[in-house]
UniProtKB/Swiss-Prot annotation:
Membership in a protein family: Belongs to the RuvB family.
Gene Ontology terms: biological process: box C/D snoRNP assembly; chromatin remodeling; DNA recombination; DNA repair; regulation of transcription by RNA polymerase II
The protein's name in its UniProt record: RuvB-like 2
Modified residues (N-acetylalanine): 2
Length: 463
């Protein structure tokens, strides 16, 4: 009789590393200012634009103090002068506690909701509410867990949990749900845990130092903590930070919290918002909550129409308004939705309410420094001559085009088994990928070969 041997496959364990995507502004860590709000020439990923960065630093201090609401700042300048970079630097400098919402001007035009609703939601997303609440917790080291399972296999489990601190020891009776939570979290004797009395949530803090010498197989991530002292039951203040929009969505309908994850918020009634405002004001009076005025950044603000600008005028006067930062690269142009022209495509009455910060074109030295920072961010090694050629391309075309050539040149370099990007790699990708001016030149030369051409009869000097 043949014997069959069963082979068990051992699953292969792979290290899952988190991939950080490199974006256009991922190299920016802050505004690069010192304690006196003086900008450094190159710091935290920011280069040049000293006056604009100093102005942004002053606005940043006003936001941090939280004393102002409804102030609006316009960052105006030519394309490629770092307007969005300054706004991203402000977001990084503010940190995760201050709400920062970034939208583009064209995002508010949707078939699902009105323009004013989209703007209102963006405003409410930018205002945080820090809610303080006191909860009772049980904190101690697990001495023993006894679980009595019914002999039949069916029925509810019961058990006892022994917890201790340096001063006392207590036995707690356990129900079925608590036993399931302890089993799920793999809690065992020697673990230091906290139990929230209101919700029954169990949090594992680590292993007790008294068990450090026990013979046990444990991973490098095992954390050892002191055995808690004092009483087992303690009162702890927990701080939650949520945005007004999140409170709106949760209260707008039954199971509204699910809409936070799906994104299908829809239009929210003004009555709901008024009730929430009244409740938040009440919490504020009682000292339970505080308002954190955040930042709403609207890029390409000239894309808004006259109705949206009219709404912004009114919204900025509200006491629940965040600091509004807008960016535009337009000069004197037509206001969308009208036949009138205005500076930056923004009505005069709104311009009167704005603090305007202007950005100037980067110098050759600044562009070279920015390209160096981008090469470091993208892990690309480049020779000094290649930097000079790339800077020259950036001056003649645009900084964005030069930055986009970095990755392409790096790929060409790797294909020829090189380690450092040389001038030939830059020249090759420059010949492969056209910039805006060379593309326009090509179209004008071969305009008759294209299917549609609106420059009929126009001649161009291509010399």
């Amino acid at each position: 009789m043949a014997t069959v041997t069963a082979t068990t496959k051992v699953p292969e364990i792979r290290d899952v590393t988190r991939i950080e995507r490199i974006g256009a502004h991922s190299h920016i860590r802050g505004l690069g200012l010192d304690d006196a709000l003086e900008p450094r020439q190159a710091s935290q990923g920011m280069v040049g634009q000293l006056a604009a960065r100093r102005a942004a630093g002053v606005v940043l201090e006003m936001i941090r103090e939280g004393k102002i609401a409804g102030r609006a700042v316009l960052i105006a300048g030519q394309p490629g002068t770092g307007k969005t970079a300054i706004a991203m630097g402000m977001a990084q400098a503010l940190g995760p506690d201050t709400p920062f919402t970034a939208i583009a001007g064209s995002e508010i035009f949707s078939l699902e909701m009105s323009k004013t609703e989209a703007l209102t939601q963006a405003f409410r997303r930018s205002i945080g509410v820090r809610i303080k609440e006191e909860t009772e917790i049980i904190e101690g080291e697990v001495v023993e867990i006894q679980i009595d399972r019914p002999a039949t296999g069916t029925g509810s489990k019961v058990g006892k949990l022994t917890l201790k601190t340096t001063e006392m020891e207590t036995i707690y009776d356990l129900g079925t749900k608590m036993i399931e939570s302890l089993t799920k979290d793999k809690v065992q004797a020697g673990d230091v845990i906290t139990i929230d009395k209101a919700t029954g949530k169990i949090s594992k803090l680590g292993r007790s130092f008294t068990r450090a010498r026990d013979y046990d197989a444990m991973g490098s991530q095992t954390k050892f903590v002191q055995c808690p002292d004092g009483e087992l039951q303690k009162r702890k203040e927990v701080v939650h930070t949520v945005s007004l929009h999140e409170i709106d969505v949760i209260n707008s309908r039954t199971q509204g919290f699910l809409a936070l994850f799906s994104g299908d918020t829809g239009e929210i009634k003004s009555e709901v918002r008024e009730q929430i405002n009244a409740k938040v004001a009440e919490w504020r009076e009682e000292g339970k909550a505080e308002i954190i005025p955040g930042v709403l950044f609207i890029d390409e603000v000239h894309m808004l129409d006259i109705e949206s600008f009219s709404f912004l005028n009114r919204a900025l006067e509200s006491d629940m308004a965040p600091v509004l930062i807008m960016a535009t690269n337009r000069g004197i142009t037509r206001i969308r939705g009208t036949s009138y022209q205005s500076p930056h495509g923004i009505p005069i009455d709104l311009l009167d309410r704005l603090l305007i910060v202007s950005t100037s074109p980067y110098s050759e030295k600044d562009k070279k420094q920015i390209l160096r920072i981008r090469c470091e961010e993208e892990d690309v090694e480049m020779s000094e001559d290649a930097y000079t050629v790339l800077t020259r391309i950036g001056l003649e075309t645009s900084l964005r085009y030069a930055i986009q050539l970095i990755t392409a040149a790096s790929l060409v370099c790797r294909k020829r088994k090189g380690t450092e990007v040389q001038v030939d790699d830059i020249k090759r990708v420059y010949s492969l990928f056209l910039d805006e001016s060379r593309s326009t030149q090509y179209m004008k030369e071969y305009q008759d070969a294209f299917l549609f051409n609106e420059l009929k009869g126009e001649t161009m000097d291509t010399s």
